[in-house]
């Protein structure tokens, strides 16, 4: 079962927490859920160059707080914060509520599964050999502290007539171990031969305490230690 299920959903409430953190009654729930989906789709498309790792949405008391985890926050903020203000206004229109926007820098994109998957997909679109892209990602992740990584690419790899799946793994990736801190990300590469899917699993160690926020807190501490300074964060109200 651990081999097939989404590793993040499998660990929700154990050492991972939700990316949408709000409660609503039955009348509003469907509308707010669709708003979340639209916000994420819009940000992923609009800020594709910024390397979006995760979008966290909170809704405290008729407001909306959106936290964007990005590898290149400068592209979102813009010169003197002009771009982030435009983005905040657009999100306010989409939600019909006051929106607060936070930008958090991901200091180690090489060990973030979503960013690794996006990087490999972009290389496939540029016709980089898939084996070279996968090996380079594996080596970078292991060098920067990952305890294990697994990458799969599926589709008409290299323009082959028949689609197939290729994968690489290095280190340990214990998918059945619930205390394991496993990050998971996917991406799609739109090549001339069709769409190729990329999946990435990264094992970052074990979390022994039973705390849904443990994984997020641990990632922040790791970023601060590895980045040589305090966490870079921009908040715009």
From Swiss-Prot:
The GO biological-process annotations, alphabetized, read as: translation
Task: Report the Pfam families cross-referenced here.
Answer: KH_2, Ribosomal_S3_C
Give the Gene Ontology MF terms in alphabetical order.
mRNA binding; rRNA binding; structural constituent of ribosome
Q: SMART domains from the entry?
A: KH
Q: Does the keyword Cytoplasm apply?
A: no
Disulfide cysteine pairs (residue numbers)? none
Q: Does the keyword rRNA-binding apply?
A: yes
Q: Mind listing the UniProt keywords for this protein, alphabetically?
A: Ribonucleoprotein, Ribosomal protein, RNA-binding, rRNA-binding
Stored InterPro entries: KH_dom, KH_dom-like_a/b, KH_dom_type_2, KH_sf_prok-type, Ribosomal_S3_C_sf, Ribosomal_uS3_bac-typ, Ribosomal_uS3_C, Ribosomal_uS3_CS
Q: Where is this region: Disordered?
A: 213-237
Identify the residues that the record assigns to the KH type-2 domain, covering every copy. 39-107
Q: Cellular component terms, GO, for this chain's entry?
A: cytosolic small ribosomal subunit
Could you tell me what this protein does? Binds the lower part of the 30S subunit head. Binds mRNA in the 70S ribosome, positioning it for translation.
Q: What does the annotation say about its assembly with partners?
A: Part of the 30S ribosomal subunit. Forms a tight complex with proteins S10 and S14.
Family membership noted in the UniProt record = Belongs to the universal ribosomal protein uS3 family.
**Name of the protein described by the UniProt record:** Small ribosomal subunit protein uS3
What is the species listed in this Swiss-Prot or TrEMBL entry? Answer: Sinorhizobium medicae (strain WSM419) (Ensifer medicae)
